[in-house]
C-alpha cells in the first residue's frame, strides 16, 4: 500500500517571500482551501516542511 498525502492550502501566500509562493505553486495549490493529493516521498515532504505554516496535511492510506 502506497501512502498519499492530502495537502490543503489554509493560509494566503499574499505578503509571503517569493520562495514560499513558488513552493506552494509547485505543490499544485492555487487557491485557498484547495486540496491536492501527492505520493508521500522525501521531495514532497521537504516542500511541505518549507510551507508548513501555510498548509494542512492529512495522510491517506491507498489500498
Curated annotation (Swiss-Prot):
Top-level lineage group: Bacteria
Assembly: Part of the 50S ribosomal subunit.
Keyword Ribonucleoprotein in record: yes
A single GO cellular-component term on record: cytosolic large ribosomal subunit
GO MF, any single term: structural constituent of ribosome
Keywords: Ribonucleoprotein, Ribosomal protein
Family classification: Belongs to the universal ribosomal protein uL30 family.
Keyword Protein biosynthesis: no
InterPro entries (UniProt xref): Ribo_uL30_ferredoxin-like_sf, Ribosomal_uL30_bac-type, Ribosomal_uL30_CS, Ribosomal_uL30_ferredoxin-like
CDD domains, alphabetized: Ribosomal_L30
Natural source organism: Geobacillus stearothermophilus
Signal peptide start-end: none
Biological processes per GO annotation: translation
Protein name: Large ribosomal subunit protein uL30
